[in-house]
């Protein structure tokens, strides 16, 4: 019987996606998020009793490592790399690392119970790869394996990115997805009618994971995945560029994005905590973009900028 090491990281909610990605990079085969905010304000229904919880900025991210890895070495590596996040302006809070051994059957049950089909936007629903789900009329299904890496698509930053794509895509566009992670934004772009999608990520693990998720979704052979450092060296012009990454990294792609976005095209950015919003907005406007839409969900911000000479329909125009 195989055994696994279950490792739980208690961090600031702001660091959810970054830490989840890091856990996968260090060998985890799956992650699950426990957030007290998910229970706040919910009424008991369908026989379920939600626990009494208080608002907290901390969340618990549970990762599952095969017993072939030395969990103490993993914990030491994680502690060092989490400390480096502060240098990117991402506050992790007081990090605690707890671990325990788990048999394979328990891991399978514990891991999958966190994930159910989730309607994200008017048209888009994300469905775990193992779920037999029948789409309703007009519903577009994105199949993902949440255990692979890089989130499930239900984080506020991803939700707002998907909503923005749904608003700007009309069919036939070329899209560039910067920092693709799970590939969810590329898959959504294809389902929403984009003609060609180019997905880039600096992490080779993300490139593999994105391709595996893409392969699970029929009709997505118009998505081209490659390793890349933001937009460096990219010559392909696009109608839409979307990037759901840290604010301190977003400011380094706005100039290249303006170079590549076609006239009347869009730059969608997400992953921006409120205290970094002004910095990102100023970077995009300095590059030549005009703000068309600003979205806020909790402490997270997302935006749609437009490359246009007609500013009558943009914020402040």
Swiss-Prot record:
Pfam family, one: PrmA
Cellular component per GO, a single term: cytoplasm
Recorded family membership: Belongs to the methyltransferase superfamily. PrmA family.
InterPro entries the UniProt entry points to: Ribosomal_L11_MeTrfase_PrmA (IPR050078), Ribosomal_PrmA_MeTrfase (IPR004498), SAM-dependent_MTases_sf (IPR029063)
Keyword S-adenosyl-L-methionine: yes
UniProt protein name: Ribosomal protein L11 methyltransferase
Its EC number(s): 2.1.1.-
Record's keyword annotation contains Hydrolase: no
Catalysed reactions, as listed in the record: L-lysyl-[protein] + 3 S-adenosyl-L-methionine = N(6),N(6),N(6)-trimethyl-L-lysyl-[protein] + 3 S-adenosyl-L-homocysteine + 3 H(+)
Molecular function as annotated in GO: protein-lysine N-methyltransferase activity
Superkingdom per UniProt: Bacteria
Phylogenetic lineage: Bacteria, Bacillati, Bacillota, Bacilli, Lactobacillales
Species of origin: Streptococcus agalactiae serotype Ia (strain ATCC 27591 / A909 / CDC SS700)
